[in-house]
Amino acid sequence: MKTKIFNTFSISVKAKKIISVYSEIELLQSWQKASAKDPVLFLGSGSNTLFLENYQGTIILNRIKGFHVKENNFFWNIHVCSGELWHNIVTICVNKGISGLENLSWIPGYTGAAPIQNIGAYGVEFKQVCSYVDFIFLETGEKVRLSSQECNFGYRKSIFNSSKKFFNYAIVAIGLKLKKKWKACLNYTDLSFLEKEYVSPKKIYNKIFYIRKEKIPNPVYFGNAGSFFKNPLISSKQAKKILKNYPKAPCFKQLNGNVKFSAGWIIEACGLKGYKLGKAAVYHKQASIIINTGSATGYEIAYLAKYIFCIVKKNFSIQLEPEVKFISKIGEIKASKIIS
């Protein structure tokens, strides 16, 4: 009997089998047993995943729990197991007076996914608070710890999703290092009006809740994965051409000379805000989000993403890259095979 897969896109898909694991040993044994005969996929909350069709294998849900804090005069050092919900960890820290994670609040998903894509929001990235990542090579059972520097973090990437070495592995814990000498990060436009003299981690946390509530639809009503595309990084030369025609386009200069543009703004500038294709649509409040308006299939969502990709490439000579992982019947596939 196949089991229904929960995913925030609300795509109706099933897997051959779904297993929840609560310890490293259980995770390793479950993978070794299942992988002997079927494809295996690790899944958190299904919040950044697009299932194109039913999955013909076993899904393992990592639910390994644990949260431990050590501190000194300068830092909070926190060890978090990968089966903890990321937002719950942020909430616990804010409520305990531990600062540094508040800009990363209300991000769905489990902690184990945070380092893979180097999650980021409102001016802060995971790499800025990461001390280490613990993972297991599943074929050998070897447990390894990488420092933050060894993880090779970049914009929405890390060694875990950009190196062929990391194929059969599972993240089991992360380390966070948070400065006690707190400085508010208010670089993001919607946070910039907060008064620095009176701002606190709790105020930032609460403000981000209202921002996200306004911009991101509730998956209960409209299935979605938040921002579907990464904000593109382009050369300064190409950026100048765009800014000549759109002088108010939101963009941010990077240390390496490139310029980051808002994917949502680019999509909206192409006239695609609110555009519908079957049961899939570009969200009318935030063009970077693709929603399931009812009973869309995974392929309908993907076809809309492909249409957006083509229009943006035609109008701006920019190739958008999905943040969302595409899952076929036997596992993850490159999004470029579907949308480009």
Curated annotation (Swiss-Prot):
Signal peptide (residue range): none
Does this UniProt record's set of keywords contain Acetylation?
A: no
Gene Ontology BP annotations: cell division; cell wall organization; peptidoglycan biosynthetic process; regulation of cell shape
The reactions it catalyses are:
UDP-N-acetyl-alpha-D-muramate + NADP(+) = UDP-N-acetyl-3-O-(1-carboxyvinyl)-alpha-D-glucosamine + NADPH + H(+)
User: What is the gene name?
Assistant: murB
Cell compartments where the protein resides: Cytoplasm
Look up the record and name the cofactor or cofactors this protein needs.
FAD
Q: Which UniProt keywords apply?
A: Cell cycle, Cell division, Cell shape, Cell wall biogenesis/degradation, Cytoplasm, FAD, Flavoprotein, NADP, Oxidoreductase, Peptidoglycan synthesis
Name where it mostly resides: cytoplasm
Q: What is its EC number?
A: 1.3.1.98
Which molecular function GO terms apply here? FAD binding; UDP-N-acetylmuramate dehydrogenase activity
Under the heading HAMAP family, the entry gives: MurB
Q: Which InterPro entries match?
A: FAD-bd_PCMH, FAD-bd_PCMH-like_sf, FAD-bd_PCMH_sub1, FAD-bd_PCMH_sub2, MurB, MurB_C, MurB_C_sf, Oxid_FAD_bind_N
Would you tell me the protein name for this molecule? Answer: UDP-N-acetylenolpyruvoylglucosamine reductase
Domain FAD-binding PCMH-type stretches: 11-181
Q: Which family does it belong to?
A: Belongs to the MurB family.
Name the residues annotated as catalytic in the UniProt entry: 156, 227 (proton donor), 323
- What's this protein's function? Cell wall formation.
Q: Which GO terms describe its cellular component?
A: cytosol
